[in-house]
Amino acid sequence: MNIFGTRLKFTSFGESHGVAVGCIIDGMPAGVKFDEEFLQNELDKRKGGSKFATPRKESDKAQVLSGVFEGYTTGHPIAIVVFNENAHSKDYDNLKDLFRPAHADFTYFYKYAIRDHRGGGRSSARESVARVAGGAVAAMLLREFGICVQSGVFGVGTFVSNLKEEEFDFEFAKKSEIFCLDPKLESDFKNEILNARNSKDSVGAAVFTKVSGMLVGLGEVLYDKLDSKLAHALMGINAVKAVEIGEGINASKMRGSCNNDALKDGKFLSNHSGGILGGISNGENLILKTYFKPTPSIFAKQESIDKFGNNLEFELKGRHDPCVGVRGSVVASAMVRLVLADCLLLNTSANLNNLKNAYGLK
């Protein structure tokens, strides 16, 4: 499906080499200040063009078509479109019948019996433009509640930061070309990416997301837990293969006496849970880690088959990220924002008092 969310519904559309990509956000309350400069800044952060990303250069200028009047949301669907300006579709002519390893080519073809071979169509990282635009709109609502979502890269390939989570430098990441959270490892991360690119290869990355200013009570029990929604959102990003919340995998190695977050004087003494208990936020920072596989598009010679079953050896052309996880950090923030904004709106009917308050009743 191309629709995400319950009360705040996000729909993305468009393909890598189509006319445009974009999104529709339905359910945003009226009266939220619309920050078009912030929207554009988020899209600019996601853009390629550097030696650490795809050479494909797009202006990515957002056009807001509806849902905003005199600088504020109207309560009606917000439509945003970004036109594709720099697609080189001829680079993919030799791939029309070929299944690229680790791409969605094989599965898309066998599910739909048709696929857009130009840049991967919907499975391209280009689709994330829509996610970032939608996440930027969600952030405008979260601002009203003091909720801040930040992401950055803490690992590239075998290089992984050993800093404690509270030591990650988000101010440095804002200035870093690769959104690096550990100043001492930035050069190692960059060299790893460039070495992969120069070897006609690619490399994976690990992204850390922190949400501060959290409120108590976001999320539902059982099947709509906040952690379930966040994992769903992050795993839906192309190239993501794993997500951790709080201690994540480490929790399976711990004892309860260590993993439990004790309380004293109305405060939690630790945050092993990553800010979520029983599927509901407890007011502590949300802590998430998202792991991206190496970009499937590499320039080394590879083996595969075509749709007729013939064995083939081929080399890719085109423009591709040597490490898709770098720009993926911007996308991770966007998806977390969409989840939290949706949960905020769902809470208006979580209990009778909330519902009465929405109508000014006691």
Swiss-Prot record:
Functional description taken from the UniProt entry: This reaction introduces a second double bond into the aromatic ring system.
The similarity comment for this entry is: Belongs to the chorismate synthase family.
Q: Which domain of life is it from?
A: Bacteria
Q: InterPro entries of this UniProt entry?
A: Chorismate_synth (IPR000453), Chorismate_synth_AroC_sf (IPR035904), Chorismate_synthase_CS (IPR020541)
Q: Which gene encodes it?
A: aroC
Q: Which CDD domains match?
A: Chorismate_synthase (cd07304)
Protein name, as recorded: Chorismate synthase
Q: What class of enzyme is it?
A: lyase
Q: What's a single GO MF annotation on this record?
A: FMN binding
The EC number of this protein is 4.2.3.5
Please name the source species.
Answer: Campylobacter jejuni subsp. doylei (strain ATCC BAA-1458 / RM4099 / 269.97)
Required co-factors? FMNH2
Q: Which GO terms describe its biological process?
A: amino acid biosynthetic process; aromatic amino acid family biosynthetic process; chorismate biosynthetic process
Its pathway, per UniProt, is: Metabolic intermediate biosynthesis; chorismate biosynthesis; chorismate from D-erythrose 4-phosphate and phosphoenolpyruvate: step 7/7
For FMN, which residues are the binding ones? Answer: 122-124, 238-239, 278, 293-297, 319
Q: Which reaction does it catalyse?
A: 5-O-(1-carboxyvinyl)-3-phosphoshikimate = chorismate + phosphate
Q: How does it assemble?
A: Homotetramer.
Textual note on the cofactor:
Reduced FMN (FMNH(2)).
Which residues are recorded as binding NADP(+)? 46
Q: Which GO terms describe its cellular component?
A: cytosol
- Keyword annotations of the record: Amino-acid biosynthesis, Aromatic amino acid biosynthesis, FAD, Flavoprotein, FMN, Lyase, NADP
Pfam families linked to this entry: Chorismate_synt
